[in-house]
Amino acid sequence: MKSYKNTDKIPPIMLGSSTPKEWRIPLIDWDRPPWNRWTFQNIRQILPTANIKRNKNFVSELKYNLHNIEDIMFKDTNGKDTSVSTMLEDTYTDGFLVHIDGQVIHESYYNGMEPSSLHIAQSVSKSVTSTVAGILIGRGLLDPGQMITHYLPELENTAWNGATLQHVFDMTSGVKFSEEYDVRNSDIGKMDVASSWKPIPEGSDPNEY
């Protein structure tokens, strides 16, 4: 099913008990369009989550110096002239924040999202983790040449045994892993089921996961 853009009329996805069957989220495809336009801001209604509290002693207030950048023109990957606003529309963006030199210069939200909305982070989590790890390495608290099992002994009986922290950062650990999202029986597909990210496909053997 085709997704909907921010300027399109929002379809009646999950509008209560009276929601027509065709607009109820299929759990096997909750992270695919058009469903992800709703689920990415309502992930707690799809998957179990947990609150991670911040340390109130280490909070930095954001400084703002807002500018309208949506009319800025640039060339897209096809060499065609486009604007920031068009790019945000074409990429189904929910929220867009630009932070430069300690200041927020642009902040905008779409598809019903607000500054206080909870939104799934997906692989942004890897970027945050790597950034924090880089800071810890700079402080001498992590050794990139150390074996990953030194920090996570739980991985000793896995394919990660023998890989260094640097291998993991560079994605050169050599672990065999198929990341074909459209193949249900791929490694990433099996991991999704084993981690309860996705339900067991109908007709599958639960022992495969």
Q: At which residue positions do the language-model features occur?
A:
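Active-site helix/loop module of the DD-peptidase/beta-lactamase fold
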Residues: 120, 138-181
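Loop-to-helix entry region of an early transmembrane alpha helix in multi-pass inner-membrane enzymes
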Residues: 115-119
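N-terminal leader/targeting segments and the immediately adjacent pre-domain N-terminus
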Residues: 1-113, 142, 170, 174, ...
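Short, charged, amphipathic alpha-helices and their helix-cap/turn boundaries
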Residues: 84, 103-108, 147-150, 184-209
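Active/ligand-binding-proximal structured segments within catalytic/core domains
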Residues: 129
